[in-house]
Regions:
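Membrane transport/envelope proteins' first extracytoplasmic loop
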Residues: 1-221
Length: 221
């Protein structure tokens, strides 16, 4: 069992590297200005705007992101890696539970989308709606990715039932530590930083449901 666990974890790490799994993320109350983002990227850190909108799909919630190009890239099991306008990429378990396949039409926020890809992303290996959740239910929550133009159209349509979430993901690239980035953020935008999730502990907890010490015990054994 331990050998199988190590193989799965190794495969997960390899996939995470290929698809640029985030080193961490931070949320803000107000989007950063271009100059504030530049203050971070000039230090050698890669930053990606990863805002999202939540929509009702019957009893379920579908969280929509703009398709990613730098961090936490979509890994298709079927179909496309990036959507064209009018297309959507869906997390595979949500698609399965809702019997959605390539070429199907899905209506989100009053707009019709063609399902062009089905797969996963490193930050949603387990699709928890909130980091505090302890169970995954793909009947009730999933994620999708659309073009920048379609994302803006959905936002303008106003049918999202929660306000837009302002999250940024980052890759440190060896330029600084998580703590140094956190301090830089707090200096750059007083009272604006809502949350900072540092990857070393939080990512494991969010994506496995196991505390870090249990993960370490599994590796040691």
């Amino acid at each position: 069992i331990v050998g199988a666990s190590e193989t799965i974890m190794q495969g997960t790490e390899e996939s995470a590297a290929v698809h640029h799994r985030e080193d961490g993320q931070f949320g803000v109350f107000v989007p950063l200005t271009d100059s504030e983002v530049t203050q971070i990227t000039d230090k050698g850190v890669t930053v990606q705007q990863d805002f999202s909108l939540d929509f009702h799909q019957g009893q379920a919630t579908l969280r929509i992101y703009q398709a990613r190009e730098k961090i936490d890239l979509f890994a298709p099991e079927q179909g496309a890696e990036l959507p064209m306008q009018g297309e959507i990429l869906l997390e595979q378990h949500y698609a399965e539970k809702h019997e959605l396949g390539l070429g199907d039409t899905l209506t989100v926020g009053g707009r019709d989308f063609i399902v062009a890809g089905i797969g996963s992303t490193p930050d949603y290996d387990a699709t928890y709606e909130k980091t505090s959740d302890t169970t995954v239910d793909s009947n009730l929550f999933g994620v999708g990715f659309v073009t920048a133009e379609d994302y803006e159209a959905l936002k303008a349509g106003g049918q999202n039932f929660r306000t837009e979430d302002y999250t940024y993901t980052y890759l440190l690239n060896g330029a600084m530590t998580d703590q140094e980035l956190k301090e830089l953020l707090q200096q750059a935008k007083d009272n604006n930083v809502k949350s900072v999730i540092l990857d070393a502990y939080e990512w494991q907890l969010t994506n496995t449901g196991l505390p870090q010490e249990q993960m370490n015990d599994a590796i040691d054994k």
